[in-house]
Amino acid sequence: WKIQTIANTSQLQFDQEFGNTFFGTGDTLINAESLMKLKAKNPIEALESGNLLIYEKTQKNHAYIMTVDVSKGRGQDYSTFTIIDISASPFRQVAVYRNNVISPILYPNIIYKYAKVYNDAYVVIEANDQGGIVCNGLYHDFEYENMYLESAVKADKIGVEITRKSKRIGCSSFKDLLENDKLEIVDQETIMEISTFEARGQS
């Protein structure tokens, strides 16, 4: 029965439904009640060798935002992006990309491709460490201008520099959106990650 149920849903949904794992205990950033409401969906399509999961196709006249995290591409941390439909409340997660071997030099190609697919999505890239390479590649090489800039004049001011302050603001905004049902997250891996976010001190 358990195997059949998991096959028809997912391990995450089974654990949520039947109490094997209780998310949101301890000092998680998002409260338990909100975490329990999150329901993973199956993607309607997998592209880019399975690294890109599509949950909703692009809709005409809809506005999208793409948030981008960059890793070194050496098989450890993942370079990821999430595409959110921000046309109406609640906002909806519509696509997720994850790849732990893509080089920061090649990553702008993928970002550009799907930012264009999703109606020239507004792109926000974490500029720390390898992120600067990706920011400059997208903005200067691809001449993609619909992205967050701290300054268009200074080369190192493209994207968002993650500091303790900006992380605190970002986490607070994310918490507000989720706990007030203003954002729907449907990707299983994303839900698992959200469930382990911990609130630690001032950061």
Language-model-derived ranges and their functions:
Residues K2-A152, D156-R164, R168, S172, ...:
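RNase H-like, metal-dependent nuclease domains and their acidic two-metal-ion catalytic environment used
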